[in-house]
A protein has these predicted regions:
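A short, flexible loop at the N-terminus of ABC-type nucleotide-binding domains that lies
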Residues: 2-6, 10-29, 72-76, 111, ...
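ABC nucleotide-binding domain signature
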Residues: 33-34, 76-78, 82-92, 193
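ABC ATPase nucleotide-binding domains
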Residues: 83, 96-234
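Helix-to-loop junction immediately C-terminal to a conserved catalytic motif
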Residues: 51
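Glycine/charge-rich catalytic "coupling/switch" loops of P-loop NTPases
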Residues: 228, 263-318, 330-361
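The feature captures the beta-strand-to-loop junction immediately N-terminal to the Walker
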Residues: 36-38
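Conserved ABC transporter NBD signature motif
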Residues: 59-71
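ABC ATPase nucleotide-binding domain helices that frame the ATP-binding cleft
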Residues: 44-47, 147
Length: 361
């Protein structure tokens, strides 16, 4: 279609993996598709094939009615003709050029007046005023990233391709730039494909997430749906669902399903009315812990167990609880101290029925 990018291609490596990219992206409006997955899942390969930097083995890529690649027809449009903006993971700034020089390098071939005007626009847009004469080594990580973005945007590309755009930044800078980048992408109105393995980044930037694993696209959808309702156990593991256990539906009451998980009874919302064997997915932040065995919550699922591990993770702690199966909870480090959580501590884990996602198996 003329108002979207479609891609269905495979890249095979001799004696190596095969990467299969199947993507669809609306064009002509701001839309960010995030390719999310672990290292080696094929994210950057897909990005490079979209850019024309690598040639797929088979398949087709089309953008707004223009064929960029067609293996059968022998079509391979050059990267320049695709009019894309590609932000490399390391930014690839020229160390010998100033900020202004890096930006205007992308504007070669246009008149001097138009070049200067566009450079001023980008310096203002990316908050780089006053830094024009500095070289990359004199800039902070966040400033370098903004210069790289300015250079990528200089030619008003039809499509933006961002390869791990925030990975080179320290944590505090990454948090600040993340919000700036989201606003910039929406403000520019350029369709974007962004690669990341950071789920916080994916949630912050994406209109849509494509989860990759083993060289193929496993699930595509809105970020809240993909991260809270993974399509299968493989996706659940990739997006970081901490507890994935096998169970069986043994009873149904209205839209609720009773499940047996190794002798433990749990209730889950099951609006689709599926039955039989399934996986239960429970995110750690949906588990509440109380000391003792007398729960105060009205939630349906109260599981008596004992703490087997308390693992600090920055401002929070991951707590493993043996309750017939291993359930992971996420609590603040202060809460872990207040509750005196340690291996052997008896606790009750509480999980709402609506927080348990079921996947048929």
């Amino acid at each position: 279609m003329a108002d979207e990018m479609t891609a269905d291609f495979e890249k095979r490596y001799n004696g190596g993996p095969s990467i299969h990219g199947v993507l669809r992206l609306p064009v002509g409006k701001p839309h960010v598709l995030v390719l999310f997955g672990p290292s080696g899942s094929g994210k950057t390969t897909i990005l490079r094939c979209l850019a024309g930097l690598e040639r797929p083995t088979r398949g087709r890529i089309a953008f707004a009615g223009q064929t960029w690649f067609d293996a059968e027809a022998g079509v391979q449009t050059s990267p320049q003709a695709r009019a894309i903006g590609y932000l490399f993971q390391d930014y690839a700034l020229f160390p010998h050029l100033t900020v202004a020089g890096n930006i205007t390098f992308a504007l070669r071939g246009i008149g001097a007046e138009a070049c200067a005007r566009r450079a001023r626009e980008l310096l203002d847009l990316l908050h780089l005023q006053g830094l024009e004469d500095r070289r990359p080594a004199q800039l902070s990580g966040g400033q370098q990233q903004r210069v790289a973005l300015a250079r990528v945007l200089a030619r008003s590309p039809r499509l933006l391709l961002l390869d791990e755009p925030l990975s080179a930044l320290d944590a505090p800078t990454r948090e600040q730039v993340r919000g700036e980048l989201r606003g910039l992408l929406r403000g520019q109105g350029i369709p974007t494909v962004c690669v990341t393995h950071d789920w916080v980044e994916a949630l912050a930037l994406a209109d849509e997430v494509a989860v990759l694993g083993g060289g193929r696209v496993l699930q595509v959808g809105p970020p809240d749906e993909v991260f809270s309702r993974p399509a299968d156990a493989d996706v659940a593991a990739i997006v970081g669902v901490e507890t994935v256990v096998a169970g069986k539906i043994v009873e149904r009451v209205d839209d609720l399903a009773a499940l047996d998980v190794g002798g433990v009874r749990l209730w889950a919302v099951d609006a689709h009315g599926q039955g039989g064997e399934c996986y239960l997915c429970i995110r750690a932040e949906d588990v509440t812990l109380e000391i003792g065995t007398r729960p105060s919550s009205s939630a349906r699922n109260h599981l008596a167990g004992r703490v087997t591990e308390v693992r600090p993770a920055g401002p929070v702690s991951r707590v493993a609880v043996a309750c017939g199966f291993t359930l992971t909870a996420l609590v603040t480090r202060q809460a872990a101290q207040d509750l005196a959580l340690k291996p052997g501590t008896p606790v009750t884990a509480t999980v709402k029925a609506s927080a348990i996602h079921l996947i048929p198996r």
